[in-house]
Amino acid sequence: MAVKALNPKAEVARAQAALAVNISAARGLQDVLRTNLGPKGTMKMLVSGAGDIKLTKDGNVLLQEMQIQHPTASLIAKVATAQDDITGDGTTSNVLIIGELLKQADLYISEGLHPRIVAEGFEIAKEKALEVLEQVKVTKEMDRETLIDVAKTSLRTKVHTELADILTEAVVDSVLAVRKPGEPIDLHMVEIMEMKHKSETDTTLIRGLVLDHGARHPDMKKRVEDAYILTCNVSLEYEKTEVSAGFFYKSAEEREKLVKAERKFIEDRVSKIIDLKRRVCGDSDKGFIVINQKGIDPFSLDALAKEGIVALRRAKRRNMERLTLACGGTAMNSVEDLTPDCLGHAGLVYEYTLGEEKYTFIEKCDNPRSVTLLIRGPNKHTLTQIKDAVRDGLRAVKNAIEDGCVIPGAGALEVAVANALVKHKPNVKGRAQLGVQAFADALLIIPKVLAQNSGYDPQETLVKVQAEHAESGQLTGVDLNTGEPMVAAAAGIWDNYNVKKQLLHSCTVIASNILLVDEIMRAGMSSLKG
């Protein structure tokens, strides 16, 4: 052992031992996530060192929050979280398939097959699997109904069914609102706002914006209908200079002059806004609202309140962009060239007070290009759970629109691919066939676990589904309510195409990499110090 001679403290695991260590790590991770695949999966409760509780069913959240010691397990966890970052779904399946690929490969390797040959078989199988994926994808018009099915499939695996059905519509409508033809969809234009009250089923989509602060002046109206909205980034307060400068005055009068000049400078700005308001509103009842990114001092607030203008100060930067998209108009950086064209319009603006906090709702916009999902829930972990789910739901809808096609879900794809691989096996040269067989068997973990989590017998269900698939030639998945086979497409259970594609790629690559490890050395520089 060369390493031992050089560094007696090094820990080394060779050939079979190294493989055994890696495979047991993958299986350990698989066992943890196994029970929360699919809509009937179970919850996991994570308690941090500080006693914070997190209830989740989302594989991604679990993997990020769990403290994973084992190097191989953390490698698999990283792949799965990367899958989530890219596509927003498929983390649990990812871990399950990698674990299962290694488990199947282990059967052959323990009989003396070289890991390299298994890895070659995996590679051949992956190419074939991607071909099958291309054949079975369903290209269809992404109308609202299809998108609702896609979002529902994703959301039901994250939160319970009744809530998923409520969230689905909100999620789909919000993506359709911010979508511009021919441009990539920017999900940042959907603001996700949390309010801690009522119950989670009160989560709604607001076609406009919700700001998390209210007006700062007692005389300003709490509710304005049919309002013009001016978004601006102009300071309406006396600001100190950026460098700390001091003035020496010859006399008190000069100081007065300076103060007056500063005051006038700001008053001029305010009066320009007031002029614009008079021009567009005249004597009518229309409201006028100023939303400013910088500060507004009490004098200016007073002047604006007298004119019946509602002013909000210190809005967030990202909300400025959303405001102009939601209500139209342009954001102004100076008050010199204010014209009626730069104003947006909203049908209703009102302030809502919840406990200590104030929220300003801007609703009934004419053609909102930016919307807000208002998530309500009784406590913090419910809110976090819904927020995670909504993010993934938004991503699923976005993927479906951008792919222009979907894949039947409920384990149907996996059954079809496994079937195609078994047929394809005789065309593969030599011992690599065993790798193909291992890949085919490994994919079947998905329908098996789906059935198992719903309380059915995994083997029996799988055999039924395979028989049905062979007979009808249609993509057949598991009906989780009855445990019988069903045509996934007819039931409206759709998965994202790019999630599955990414899944096949990343699982194969990582499983092959782990198989080909034949030495694990813990011999970093740090261990020499001891």
Curated annotation (Swiss-Prot):
Biological function: Component of the chaperonin-containing T-complex (TRiC), a molecular chaperone complex that assists the folding of actin, tubulin and other proteins upon ATP hydrolysis.
GO cellular component terms given for this protein: chaperonin-containing T-complex
GO MF, one example: unfolded protein binding
UniProt key word Amino-acid biosynthesis: no
Gene Ontology biological-process annotations: protein folding
Binding of ADP, residues: G38, G90, T91, T92, S93, T157, K158, A410, D495
UniProt-annotated binding residues for ATP: G38, G90, T91, T92, A410, G411, D495, K500
InterPro entries with a match to the protein in the record: Chap_CCT_zeta (IPR012722), Chaperone_TCP-1 (IPR017998), Chaperonin_TCP-1_CS (IPR002194), Cpn60/GroEL/TCP-1 (IPR002423), GroEL-like_apical_dom_sf (IPR027409), GROEL-like_equatorial_sf (IPR027413), TCP-1-like_intermed_sf (IPR027410), TCP-1_chaperonin (IPR053374)
Entry EC number(s): 3.6.1.-
Gene designation: CCT6
Record's keyword terms, sorted: ATP-binding, Chaperone, Cytoplasm, Hydrolase, Magnesium, Metal-binding, Nucleotide-binding
PROSITE patterns linked: TCP1_1, TCP1_2, TCP1_3
Pfam families: Cpn60_TCP1
Protein location: Cytoplasm
Entry's family note: Belongs to the TCP-1 chaperonin family.
Lineage of the organism: Eukaryota, Metazoa, Chordata, Craniata, Vertebrata
Reactions listed under catalytic activity: ATP + H2O = ADP + phosphate + H(+)
Top-level taxon in the UniProt lineage: Eukaryota
Annotated residues for binding of Mg(2+): D89
Name used for this protein in its record: T-complex protein 1 subunit zeta
Subunit structure: Component of the chaperonin-containing T-complex (TRiC), a hexadecamer composed of two identical back-to-back stacked rings enclosing a protein folding chamber. Each ring is made up of eight different subunits: TCP1/CCT1, CCT2, CCT3, CCT4, CCT5, CCT6A/CCT6, CCT7, CCT8. Interacts with PACRG.
SUPFAM superfamilies xrefs: GroEL apical domain-like (SSF52029), GroEL equatorial domain-like (SSF48592), GroEL-intermediate domain like (SSF54849)
UniProt KW Oxidoreductase keyword: no
